[in-house]
Amino acid sequence: MRITPVTENLKLGDKVNKKTNHVFVFLEIFAHEGGIQSYIKDIFRAYLRFSQVYKAEVFLLRDSPDSLNPFEDENLKFHYFKNQSPYLGRLQMAAALLKCLLQSRPQQVFCGHINLAVLVQTLCQPLGIPYTVLTYGKEVWEPLKNQERHALTSANRIWTISRYSRDRACLANALNPKIVEMMPCAIDGDKFTPGCKQPELIQKYGLTGAKVLMTVARLWSGDIYKGVDVTIRALPQIAQVFPEVKYLVIGRGDDQPRLAKLAKNLGVSDRVMFAGFVATEELMEHYRLADAYIMPSQEGFGIVYLEAMACGVPVLSGDDDGSADPLQDGKLGWRVPHRSPDAVAAACIEMLQGDDQRCDQEWLREQAIALFGIDAFQQHLQKMLLSSVIDPFKSK
């Protein structure tokens, strides 16, 4: 692992942008792919599209200067602090961040993870600089350590991606809901579009003539809340009405052997196809294989539902999680008890019959893009940034 010296980041002699509007502090954006990283990239993509020019400094604890960064811009300056010693990297970032705050006095600091909230609070509060903590999901659903909870409750604002995540975080950590604001995920309508099923993929997965249910999920034994096992248990009932049904599971992980054994024990192993890992750029063609996207899970939000809907694929989710937002409380999809195979089976049969408006490909895509497309996301982000300037110390 390459050690990044302080001199490659923000040296004491360097000048920072005196007109800096915002400072963003994240663990990482480019070192790993995931929901949080994708969400942050959407924020920067929208940030650079604003007609009003903002300038920002971005501090990345675990990313290195050789990261492939498409957001480098004169108005978006990045500082990298990946280091062989995590302690030294954090120390370097803290020193550089303090220097930036002292010199540029930004309007608002955005802390991108609860693990950085104590550092941001420690530096911002004595200087009277308001800070916002961005939360994504499970990292704030349980009671936090005292210092982290204090940093969160002391924030001027908290952003989160769904009402469910807001409610879980507030309940677990005694937060005032008034300072928690919704900043939902976005979907790129140009990247995910409807289209024909590719013959090559149909042949590859043995889906000729099949009604295809699909799930995209990590198959980790410590993270079984995606509901793949529940969908497998529902297959025998679905097959009674649709004998041609098959279930395509995209994703990898150590829980696959258990799921494969479950399918075998239920006599549906010939109906379950484990595709393994599929690269992001190939996902759209796989969504197009599906007649229904099925994930009766417990999500903080569920970007995969938006991806499926943008491809015109009807969706099913659990009924007690953050999917209420992308599915608009059931207006755009089916919501069922997430551990009930019977409920999943009944909903899947309705979806495959295709009579419901929520199965209308064009209508479904239209609704998803209007509410969660990049343009809507950009407008919402700009409104949030403006409100942080007008009322930086929102009432607690």
Annotate each PLM feature:
Residues 314-318:
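Short hydrophobic beta-strand element within catalytic cores of glycosyltransferases
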Residues 23-25, 207-226, 232-235:
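Conserved donor-binding/catalytic core segment of Leloir-type glycosyltransferases
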Residues 277-278, 285-290:
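Short alpha-helical donor nucleotide-sugar binding micro-motif in glycosyltransferases
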Residues 250, 257-278:
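Nucleotide-activated donor-binding/catalytic signature segment of Leloir-type glycosyltransferases, i.e.
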Residues 111-117:
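Short His-centered aromatic/hydrophobic patch
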Residues 244, 357-371:
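A short, well-ordered alpha-helix in the C-terminal region of glycosyltransferases
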